[in-house]
């Protein structure tokens, strides 16, 4: 709707709906974390007590949650029998069984970002940023969200976007995942391609330790993990393939990191960079689903953690145009951009050296 055509009353109604939706997102987050959504998906119409008992939760809290989920038109309520149900077509978008279609995972970020609201407001007045240490849950949630996509699509959909890559990995290649987190992608690739060698690189000691422990538990001799600051990484011609999953826009020095990636690749090597699907031009993002959410995530996390390190503050919505330009500046001359159906949030950049 154009602002010139919208009345004050229409705007008021639209904003009231936005507030209502924010409340609903929190309820969905609670339903995901408590297992209520998964529990209800497996139940016939049931009372609040029956649902609480099935989920192992306190009935009074469950009943209040059901009230909001009913008025939010996610849960159906039968007043005659005092029973609640979660229709299958909604469960198919809100439960763990939905895999990468599970929108309840994204809903968790609404309350998480609210936890740092006052700290971000202080930065509006004083400058600087909010450091990673203030987000103890963020990386766990990111791992959960990206893990859904990885499990469903990494081996069979994402890697084949790079022409010839699966065959190259089956033959044996040196691969690094920059900003690997706890190593979900490294684990999946190492399991699928035993002839290749995979190195996960991350700034976090905790992430590197978790990845190392998981690789040992699974007996993955072809997966190792190293702690490095990507902006200071000094590897030359070390890898045939480098992957980066939603990590560049958070970097304090993203241009330097891309240059280091280019240097670390061997001639003929390839970078598979996954990052947020958006335009670098604000006007192109107006009316695009989840754009407001992405700008909010940038303000409340991605931009500010970079600024906390005296970084560039690139932000979540740096966009396709800037991304391809920065890849070119780093030395990549052959860059293509792909999309996959199971991931509505990201572009897949394929850059060859």
From Swiss-Prot:
Could you confirm whether the keyword RNA-binding appears in this record? no
PANTHER family xref list: METHYLTRANSFERASE TYPE 11, S-ADENOSYLMETHIONINE-DEPENDENT METHYLTRANSFERASE RV2258C
Question: What's this chain's function?
Answer: Probable methyltransferase that may target bulky nonpolar molecules with aromatic rings.
UniProt similarity note: Belongs to the class I-like SAM-binding methyltransferase superfamily.
Alphabetized InterPro entries for the sequence: Methyltranfer_dom, Rv2258c-like_HTH, SAM-binding_MTase, SAM-dependent_MTases_sf
- Source species of the chain: Mycobacterium tuberculosis (strain ATCC 25618 / H37Rv)
Q: What is this protein called?
A: S-adenosylmethionine-dependent methyltransferase Rv2258c
Q: What is its EC number?
A: 2.1.1.-
User: What domain notes does the record hold?
Assistant: Consists of two domains which are linked by a long alpha-helix. The N-terminal domain is essential for dimerization and the C-terminal domain has the class I MTase fold.
Give the matching Pfam families: HTH_65, Methyltransf_31
Q: Where does S-adenosyl-L-methionine bind?
A: 146, 179, 202-203, 229-230, 251
GO terms for biological process?
A: cellular response to hypoxia; methylation
What domain of life does the UniProt record list for this protein's source? Bacteria
- Output the Gene Ontology cellular-component terms: peptidoglycan-based cell wall; plasma membrane
Q: Which GO terms describe its molecular function?
A: methyltransferase activity
What is the annotated quaternary arrangement, including any partners?
Answer: Homodimer. Co-immunoprecipitates with DarG in the presence and absence of darT.
Q: Which UniProt keywords apply?
A: Methyltransferase, S-adenosyl-L-methionine, Transferase
């Amino acid at each position: 709707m154009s602002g010139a055509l919208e009345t004050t009353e229409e705007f008021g109604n639209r904003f009231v709906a936005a507030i209502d939706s924010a409340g609903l997102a929190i309820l969905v987050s609670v339903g995901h974390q408590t297992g209520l959504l998964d529990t209800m998906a497996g139940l016939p119409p049931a009372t609040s007590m029956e649902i609480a008992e099935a989920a192992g939760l306190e009935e009074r809290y469950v009943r209040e949650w059901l009230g909001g989920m009913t008025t939010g038109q996610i849960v159906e309520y039968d007043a005659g029998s005092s029973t609640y149900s979660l229709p299958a077509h909604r469960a198919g978008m809100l439960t763990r069984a939905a895999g990468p279609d599970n929108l309840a995972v994204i809903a968790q970020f609404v309350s998480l970002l609210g936890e740092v609201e006052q700290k971000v407001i202080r930065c509006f007045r004083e400058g600087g940023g909010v450091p990673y240490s203030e987000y103890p849950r963020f990386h766990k949630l990111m791992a959960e969200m990206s893990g859904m996509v990885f499990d469903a699509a990494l081996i069979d959909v994402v890697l084949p976007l790079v022409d010839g890559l699966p065959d190259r990995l089956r033959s044996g290649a040196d691969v690094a995942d920059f900003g690997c987190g706890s190593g979900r992608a490294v684990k999946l690739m190492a399991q699928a391609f035993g002839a290749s060698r995979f190195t996960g690189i991350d700034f976090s000691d905790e992430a590197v330790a978790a990845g190392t422990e998981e690789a040992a538990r699974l007996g993955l001799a072809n997966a190792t993990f190293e702690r490095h600051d990507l902006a200071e990484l000094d590897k030359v011609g070390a890898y045939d393939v480098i992957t980066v999953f939603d990590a560049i826009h958070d970097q304090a020095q993203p241009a330097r990191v891309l240059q280091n990636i280019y240097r670390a690749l061997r001639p003929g090597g390839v970078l598979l960079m996954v990052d947020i699907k958006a335009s670098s031009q604000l006007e192109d993002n107006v009316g695009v689903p989840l754009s407001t959410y992405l700008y909010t995530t940038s303000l409340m996390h991605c931009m500010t953690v970079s600024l906390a390190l005296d970084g560039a503050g690139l932000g979540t919505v740096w966009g396709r145009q800037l991304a391809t330009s920065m890849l070119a500046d780093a030395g990549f001359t052959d860059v293509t951009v792909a999309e996959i159906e199971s991931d509505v949030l990201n572009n897949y950049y394929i850059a060859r050296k």
